[in-house]
Amino acid sequence: MPPKPLATEILQPQADPYQHPYLKLVTDENGLRYLDIDNPKATARIALQGAHVVQWQPKTAAQPVLWLSDHARYVAGRSIRGGVPLCWPWFGAHPTDSTLCSHGFARVIPWELLHVSASETGAMRLIFQMQVTPETERQLSYPFRLVLTVTIGNRLKLDLATTNLAHHPFVIGEAYHTYFNVSDIANVSVTGLEDCMYSDKVMGYARQIEHGALCFEREFDRVFLHHNGDCILNDPGYQRRIRISKSGSNTTVVWTPWADKAHATGDMGTGDEWRRMVCIETANALENMVVINPNKTHVLTAEYSVEAL
């Protein structure tokens, strides 16, 4: 078993956490830095901008679990299209200031690697802390600490810990905006959301109750409220199911853009690349946003595992 996460602890950084036999620090032509991970259980890549897990594949899996656009833009200050972008401290548009970027700033801010360890089985735990900058202080006026623990092995586990360092409560929205790699969006289904109420963005935020498994034949963008259970992504083409387990989350978002919207993004290409992805997002959004009291910590956890179909 991998060691328990230390996301809620205050850690002193290791002298040089980058010096680990399973870890390699690389820099691309645009100056973005990544951690390439190759341990006995899995391979992965994490961008230090946004502490963004862009790739993860267990060594028992025939196909990558996460989808990464062939047309992703690797530029400072811009989110990478694919993997697991972090949405924080708001989800979607900012509630009062339309000039601020969608989904918050955590995914485009530099993070610091504090600590690296490995279990006896080879699974790795990496702990990151978001760097506070003048830009983060401009967008969020109260003090906080944001720490992400990433555990990489046969399963991918994420623990995002928000600590309120202010003298008053504050409210956050948050999500792991996870892009999953699928054989063909038209042939997969999602179970675990039956009987949940959702807000349908495609239909003007109409509220409905979900009946049955989710299948996809057009643009799909639904926010499932008051949901804290597992979801299963069933993919007969890849002969697998991906299980999404979570805690500290009362919202699940399911999104796939379909052709017109995908082509309009600018970083998903103009072909059919969009057919190979679906987002299933562990979140706290809309009326499920989280109130954090002074000196308290809220942890958002998601865990992904691959099972034979």
What do these predicted regions represent?
Residues P2-R81, G229-D230, N234-N250, W258, ...:
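Beta-strand-rich N-terminal accessory domains
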Residues T27-E29, L100-I152:
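Extended, loop-rich substrate-binding clefts of extracytoplasmic carbohydrate-active enzymes
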Residues I46, L160-A166, V306:
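Asparagine-centered strand-capping/turn motif at beta-strand->loop junctions
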Residues L66-V116, F128-Q129, N295:
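Extended, compositionally biased flexible segments
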Residues I109, C215-M289, P294:
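Acidic/His-leaning functional-site neighborhoods
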Residues L140-Y142, V150, L286-T297:
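Exposed beta-sheet edge/beta-hairpin loop segments within beta-rich domains
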Residues L146, L156-L158, H298:
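Hydrophobic core residues within well-ordered beta-strands of beta-rich domains
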Residues P169-V171, A175-V253:
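Active-site/ligand-binding surface loops and adjacent short beta/alpha elements
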